[in-house]
Amino acid sequence: MMLEPSIDKLLDQVDSKYSLVVLEAKRAHELRDKERPTKEFKSVKRTLQALEEIADGTVKIHPAPELKRETLVEKRELERLQAKMKEQLIKEQIAKEEAEEEAKQKNSRAAKAAAAE
């Protein structure tokens, strides 16, 4: 049974088998955590999907790991802020709808009181 992509093709993309295993594991974890894929996959398993991306050259070892960590921290902070903003917008929309509903009820009561007089 021949595995695709072949180890030779994979080793053309990285320096060593060790680097390949580390890159594959990290990318598989990223894919599991809903990181955006770089292509359509033939495989269903995350580890094989990571190998497909490595073989295509769309995933590389980051030359500056500290910079990548900073980028990831910034990305997570941005996602957190976006979620917070979305939550705030929803709260504002709810407050607006409640105020409109309260105004309608107030007008309805006023109309009923005027009709009763």
Swiss-Prot record:
Region of interest: Disordered: 96-117
Catalytic activities: RNA(n) + a ribonucleoside 5'-triphosphate = RNA(n+1) + diphosphate
Swiss-Prot/TrEMBL keywords: DNA-directed RNA polymerase, Nucleotidyltransferase, Transcription, Transferase
Compositional bias ranges of the Low complexity kind: 108-117
Any one Gene Ontology cellular component term annotated for this protein: DNA-directed RNA polymerase complex
Gene Ontology biological process terms, A to Z: DNA-templated transcription
Gene Ontology molecular function: DNA binding; DNA-directed RNA polymerase activity
Matches recorded under InterPro entries: DNA-dir_RNA_pol_omega, Pol_omega/Rpo6/RPB6, RPB6/omega-like_sf
Quaternary organization: The RNAP catalytic core consists of 2 alpha, 1 beta, 1 beta' and 1 omega subunit. When a sigma factor is associated with the core the holoenzyme is formed, which can initiate transcription.
Annotated family: Belongs to the RNA polymerase subunit omega family.
PANTHER family registered for this protein in UniProt: DNA-DIRECTED RNA POLYMERASE SUBUNIT OMEGA
Stated name of the protein: DNA-directed RNA polymerase subunit omega
Species this protein is from: Lactococcus lactis subsp. cremoris (strain SK11)
